[in-house]
């Protein structure tokens, strides 16, 4: 009986008939979140937040704990799947004008920032060579903040260098932040259902809606099943595809890796940071690469919501997708020509998308009026 009541609530939820597969990534993100929390709990049970024991505890979990290798790989590959889903979810929001539901978009961008922080803290926990040096480089950017930077960095590190207190803090933050993500996700979903989902045409859906259950529940379940299948296949055949070879060595203060880089899902922001040959400028560009998403609802000047009917913005959108991939690629390369030049051009084009939103919207309105 309780299950019938839950399904009845879903049945009462009206959804536009024409929403496509791109609208399924929200439920996939919810599944990823649940999976990460469950696997994270089992990993935390066997983890030791100590610089001398952290790396050994990871090896112990992989070798000696029953199904520990599966939990570890599910958690690591689950994080990559989480970011793949969130980037597609955001791209859909940008393309179809979902950002015009301002509160939902702003809460979603805040969620992205929290998620990136959580993933960064988690990347440091194995205390491998790349974990340690990525943490050193990224946290050191705080020193670029005038007046407060050095104090903030010392507070975050728990001393004058990354050491045992740093690892303890990062573990505590990695454990507590997901609860904030759950709370903010609930708010995000509540704000979304105040107005309802948009649709590919960007029109009002009130005239043509169907119940969420059974139509969209089966569609969601199909996409979730496909995602889990891809994850399990990756874990079975390519478990280390996203891992850096340097991270299979314990952190060593005396040896610097040839090329320090974070996980693949941060490479676009890291590439933007590296494209500016100035510490403060790079740190600001890094922050702006995410923060600029907050401006999108306020720079929309077009009369049409979706990019389906906006050819100029479509061109800019696909340029944005291309620059995202190019910046990610250049960030994996050494800091030398021609990669620095490519990275600088791609970073400029990345920010151009957000700045052109205002002008191109106005231009498209003018063209539409002329045609009429």
Curated annotation (Swiss-Prot):
Belongs to the cytochrome b family. The gene is MT-CYB. It is a multi-pass membrane protein. Component of the ubiquinol-cytochrome c reductase complex (complex III or cytochrome b-c1 complex) that is part of the mitochondrial respiratory chain. The b-c1 complex mediates electron transfer from ubiquinol to cytochrome c. Contributes to the generation of a proton gradient across the mitochondrial membrane that is then used for ATP synthesis. The chain crosses the membrane at residues 25-45, 69-90, 105-125, 170-190, 218-238, 280-300, 312-332, 339-358. The cytochrome bc1 complex contains 3 respiratory subunits (MT-CYB, CYC1 and UQCRFS1), 2 core proteins (UQCRC1 and UQCRC2) and probably 6 low-molecular weight proteins. A ubiquinone binds at residue 193. It comes from the Eukaryota. Gene3D superfamilies: Cytochrome Bc1 Complex, Chain C. The keyword Transmembrane applies. GO terms for cellular component: mitochondrial inner membrane; respiratory chain complex III. Heme b b562 binds at residues 75, 174. CDD domains: cytochrome_b_C, Cytochrome_b_N. Its cofactor is heme b. This is Cytochrome b. GO terms for biological process: mitochondrial electron transport, ubiquinol to cytochrome c. It comes from Sanzinia madagascariensis. InterPro entries: Cyt_b/b6_C, Cyt_b/b6_C_sf, Cyt_b/b6_N, Cytb/b6-like_sf, Cytochrome_b, Cytochrome_b_C_euk/bac, Cytochrome_b_N_euk/bac, Di-haem_cyt_TM. GO terms for molecular function: metal ion binding; ubiquinol-cytochrome-c reductase activity. Heme 1 (or BL or b562) is low-potential and absorbs at about 562 nm, and heme 2 (or BH or b566) is high-potential and absorbs at about 566 nm.
